[in-house]
Amino acid sequence: MTEQTPTPQLPADENSLIAERRAKLGALRGQGIAYPNDFVRTHFAGDLQAEFAEAETWTAEALEAADRSVKLAGRLMAKRVMGKASFAQIQDESGRVQLFLQGNVLGDAYTAFKGWDVGDIVAVEGGLTRTKTGELSVKASALRLLTKSLRPLPDKWHGLSDVEQRYRQRYVDLIVTPEAREVFIKRSKIIRAIRAWLDARRFLEVETPMMHYIPGGATAKPFTTHHNALDLDLYLRVAPELYLKRLVVGGLERVYEINRNFRNEGVSTRHNPEFTMLELYEAYATYHEIMDLTEQVIRDTAQGVLGTTQVSWDGADIDLAPAFRRWRMDEAVRHHNPEISAADCTDRAALLRHCERLKIKVKPSYGWGKLLLEIFEATVEHTLVQPTFITDHPVEVSPLARASDTEPGYTDRFELFINGKELANGFSELNDPEDQAARFQAQVQAKDGGDDEAMHYDADYIRALEYGMAPTGGLGIGIDRLVMLLTGSTSIRDVLLFPYMRPEA
């Protein structure tokens, strides 16, 4: 027996409305016209509104003289029956348009219209006119019902007031909440703009496996699955990094992928177990050039999609036009914690005392690098409102980044923070196979010590590095968080069409 999603209990009045609509559908079935599929539209509502926006030019007389015949289809969002004439509004993907309906023109179709419900999907054919109030309207010469809606839409004045219902029933949210629809249209434009930006700079888009033999590319807990035919445990990828860098070894010097990652971790306003990442690699680039690239692609995407580089996000006004600040992690920690000296930043015992003073919980396996990161996350991260690159992370928490030539224990790595949220992570890639093998081994020891997010040892990746990887810079940008920034959304669920939710009871 297959599991089924439980049907939510409905209020009695809603059940009665559904029963009425089912009866209407039954009548349509009896007439053999329940779900017709032979209508071809010629126009969209939004296009007509844009083309004939000038009311002074396109008067009712001018529109009727133009004799433009249009065929539209959409969802019935409002109706006002007034005896021999009525008005209605339909909505398609582009917007809304008013319909002017006359009984003496439509005949039986007008009679049928009186029994239709808001939410039904209809088709209309006719010419254009403008009402006395100046509203562009389709003067219907033919009208048909294409799809009977069995469930009533939410009240037009209150919409979907239950946020959880908006996420669970995104299909309803998109119908009744124009702002939600606009977020997802912008999301598509943002991703398209990023692709165009990278393609114009000779980056090659690639696809790498979604199921891995060995989880790697990020410190995160993976989802596991099983391949029955091979009798093999596999992992949904936490990041595509190691596969993309194998391609750099193979001579594809500029590669990128925009795709899903999966991490078996907590759910919050910033985290969803399944999320979209841009990850790219460029041979012969350092983390300085990758920071330049990150700054420019975000700025250009904002300008291209929004027409501005100034955005408001979660109560903060963000300006993406000025150069993003670049700040070493240890310097940022010392700035916000004057009690911590430069020497303390690499002294495990000193950092343990500071963590205890700051009431930061730590594990016995943490070295000074992990402790420094914990202090940064607790005391600095939330203060970074304007775009800031936090650079030079400790080796301990950067197992794939190139070690600094001048600062022992640190790496050539950055993370980008805006309004206290991490949006990007990048570094000069570690291309020394022996150093990488040692770092993998340290991660294995950390995993044995209880760190379930530590990486596994990937022998094939070490073999790839042994063939030689050019000096390379890499970058990962969280697309979901970038969309949050550019749409002013405060929860990651607002920018995911179908965020993960607990099953309904």
From Swiss-Prot:
Cofactor comment: Binds 3 Mg(2+) ions per subunit.
Main location: cytoplasm
Cofactor(s) required, per the database record: Mg(2+)
Keyword ATP-binding assigned: yes
Superkingdom of the organism of origin: Bacteria
Binding of Mg(2+) 1, residues: E415, E422
EC number: 6.1.1.6
UniProt cross-references to Pfam families, sorted A to Z: tRNA-synt_2, tRNA_anti-codon
Catalytic activity as recorded in UniProt: tRNA(Lys) + L-lysine + ATP = L-lysyl-tRNA(Lys) + AMP + diphosphate
Keyword terms: Aminoacyl-tRNA synthetase, ATP-binding, Cytoplasm, Ligase, Magnesium, Metal-binding, Nucleotide-binding, Protein biosynthesis
Subcellular location: Cytoplasm
GO biological process, one term: lysyl-tRNA aminoacylation
Entry's Gene Ontology cellular component terms: cytosol
Any one GO molecular-function label of the UniProt entry: ATP binding
Residues engaged in binding Mg(2+) 2: E422
Cited InterPro entries: Aa-tRNA-synt_II, aa-tRNA-synth_II, aa-tRNA-synth_II/BPL/LPL, Lys-tRNA-ligase_II, Lys-tRNA-ligase_II_N, Lys-tRNA-synth_II_C, NA-bd_OB-fold, NA-bd_OB_tRNA
UniProt KW Membrane keyword: no
Enzyme class: ligase
HAMAP family: Lys_tRNA_synth_class2 (MF_00252)
Subunit description: Homodimer.
Family the UniProt entry places it in: Belongs to the class-II aminoacyl-tRNA synthetase family.
Name of this protein: Lysine--tRNA ligase
Organism lineage string: Bacteria, Pseudomonadati, Pseudomonadota, Gammaproteobacteria, Lysobacterales
